[in-house]
């Protein structure tokens, strides 16, 4: 079994030719950083012995305040204190308003079409906001080690789409980090556990965090980590449990959330968060809000409240078992990941579903960053952790729009990475000289039910009758799950390339 250690003091790397690499778990609620060095995995602490960094950024001062100090401002300055940024990245303004209608922020777009916040009369996009978390974690590392960070592995939800992955990558690069791999969170947890799971086996990784849910089925076979299938929901997590508690408190105290100002809304949210945490270890909790009378909520009430959301995750688990061509009898280990798996009913329901007790010998809040640190060390140094091969998969199908508002799939979900695939298309009208390539991600057949990633135009098509000109469309996805698209006129070799990235305006093309 791997051993996790913590470190907060200056550390000199003694092994010769050892390059410093780090793993970062960029979370909805908290973020962490770790490094695998000299046969140990170190969770890097701040000066106050804290491993967790709240993923919160406050913009009241000239310089952004990040983490615990920002959390102190979250209630009294909600408009300028951004929480759960991970849930907002890669989304359009309309999507955010639909998903989270009561946010206190003043949202707009920057000149590149990226969702942005107006704070203290400044325009700050989601990439810049996220980068402050990476900068803070990087500074934490720099205060400990005597070497430059040569590479970082950053974990992302397995079900993140291409725009979200690109935005995280750009945020980390803005913090001057060299990104050597984007690693899916469940796969990262499997790496942390898999190093001591010597037998060949099939494992399930159930990852329920603050903002997202992932489930992955992996086959471990003589040092090969093969992801058989993955699925999830990027808008389901502990934050949703908080919102259910907010609704409960409103009913008990007769306060209408929508009629409260933003400060009281944030106070109510943080009261809900504290109740949730206390109910993890207590059978009941007393509370009051804004001088209301004292009320009591029991764990039983809370569990009934959140049970439908937990059942949603188990329904996704059922689908991923089907996608992986496995059944419950094949699953030999179920691994819990994410802070929300500390909730007793989550553990019980997962155990009942998989018909076995979950494995949680590594702290669920630290296992992902541990795996990322191991992967980073392997990619930069080799070391004792170089005896495994990682085979991940495409989380969502990718294709292009064709006539009839239909998506023609080019790469299907759960295809092993990396992958390059080409499909043939033809012109659909006489003397057609251009072709619009609209790239989409998702499982639905209809365009408006899928995620629009980008559009570009292939020009200089020879004027021929409909169907006579052949266009080859190639999709290439690298090990990070990042997409490049090429469209080529077969007869003339004229081509157009594009790498889908977060700087492509999304406000115009979201469906």
UniProtKB/Swiss-Prot annotation:
UniProt entry tagged with the keyword Transport: no
Physiological role: Chaperone involved in the maturation of iron-sulfur cluster-containing proteins. Has a low intrinsic ATPase activity which is markedly stimulated by HscB. Involved in the maturation of IscU.
PROSITE patterns, alphabetized: HSP70_2 (PS00329), HSP70_3 (PS01036)
Chain ranges passing through the membrane: none
Keywords: ATP-binding, Chaperone, Nucleotide-binding
Organism this protein belongs to: Buchnera aphidicola subsp. Baizongia pistaciae (strain Bp)
Name of the featured protein: Chaperone protein HscA
Family annotation (InterPro entries): ATPase_NBD, Heat_shock_70_CS, HSP70_peptide-bd_sf, Hsp_70_fam
Superkingdom of the organism of origin: Bacteria
Pfam family, one: HSP70
GO molecular function annotations of the record: ATP binding; ATP-dependent protein folding chaperone
Family stated for the protein in its record: Belongs to the heat shock protein 70 family.
